[in-house]
Amino acid sequence: MKLKSRFTSIIGVITLFFSQTVTAESDVVISVDEGVSMAQPIAVVPFKANGGVPADVGQIIADDLRNSGKFTPVERSKLPAQPGSAAEVNSQQWTDIGVDSVVVGQVTPTGGGYNVAYQLVDTLSNPATVLAQGAFNVPAAQIRQGAHTVSDQVFEKITQIRGAFRTKIAYVVQRGVSSYELRVSDYDGYNAFTVVKSKEPLMSPEWSPDGSRLAYVTFENKKAQVVVHDLRSGSRRVVAALRGHNGAPAFSPDGSRIAFASNQDGELDIYVVGANGGKPSKLTANAGNNTEPSWSPDGSTIYFTSDRAGSPQVYRMGSSGGGASPMGGSGSYNAKVSSDGKNLIMIAGDKVVKRDLASGGTEVLSSTFLDESPSISPNGIMVIYSSTKGTSKVLQLVSADGRFKANLPGAGGQFKFPAWSPYLTK
């Protein structure tokens, strides 16, 4: 399929930043498709609850660690004991089942909120050694954020990689032919709220580097325009409204500029405009269509999709324009760069593919159907994307090593254009 026709068919169709009211319910909830066979075993013991607790904190932590693809939590039915503190951990019981790390904790009501306390225990020593511990208060409505905080700290202590479980995702839900919602939720689908509703298509949300704004495409003025939406104030500003279509926005790493695609001169080209608007600068002027820009972490390079050689493939060029070189192979598109700049996540052969930018080696990550719009967690560990299941568009999650796969089934709608937020906490 020609890139222009593909683009045209698409066109035709913590929490301090967020002032909207959220609920503990979700549009989408992770459902495991394929577990991890080679990940590190870990035990997350059910947290002792001193009074009623509105969420299963231990289960949330276990799910987070599993979703990363780095850990295989022991099933609760196979736990040899359920200690509430490190002092109660019998190392031999855990090493006998091949578990070196155990997470224990308690949740205690604190007048309008909860105190969440945990310990990460190393069972290779006897008595067991506490590797990390913490206790903090959270409002009742943010009990899941408390659990995600534990997950982040445990994940980082063991892997030396920052956890990304307190991040969010933005995505578009389409219901029928004239109902579109841009929604934001926790990375696992909970605490979802609507940013904007429209009777016209909404597309391609992208986060600003500080997580305070979303750039996206709207047809509300009967043409495709790029707007920037401030999530704190709710205000919106049109930043790209060239003649014809405007789409595929991407913030620069410093948040000062937005790259986007427009066909105002007939074919699609890449432009850059200030994040508050202004006069766009055209970066590409080659034959063929150029779209889907994505910045490198240092802002020096833009990756994009072009059909200048006959079929779509990923190219890269300097962020000021100029010559471009092919990167992804024929049929590749939707490229995003990992936060460390080492890998390119893209679509090739309708699958999510990872390309090592140093070696050129590629690895197919997904096993779903008609995949598109991959977005990478800020620590590079997980990828969310959209795929086709039956007659529906659904969100999927895959670890960046391809070992863990899950779907986020949604109720009553087509779920498209997922975008993973940056870190939202210090």
UniProtKB/Swiss-Prot annotation:
GO biological process: cell division; protein import
Signal peptide: 1-24
Primary location recorded for the protein, binned into one broad class: periplasm
Location in or out of the cell: Periplasm
InterPro entries for this protein: 6-blade_b-propeller_TolB-like, PD40, Tol-Pal_TolB, TolB_N
Function field: Part of the Tol-Pal system, which plays a role in outer membrane invagination during cell division and is important for maintaining outer membrane integrity.
Subunit structure: The Tol-Pal system is composed of five core proteins: the inner membrane proteins TolA, TolQ and TolR, the periplasmic protein TolB and the outer membrane protein Pal. They form a network linking the inner and outer membranes and the peptidoglycan layer.
PANTHER family assigned to the protein according to its UniProt record, in alphabetical order: PROTEIN TOLB (PTHR36842:SF1), PROTEIN TOLB HOMOLOG (PTHR36842)
Family: Belongs to the TolB family.
Identification of the protein by name: Tol-Pal system protein TolB
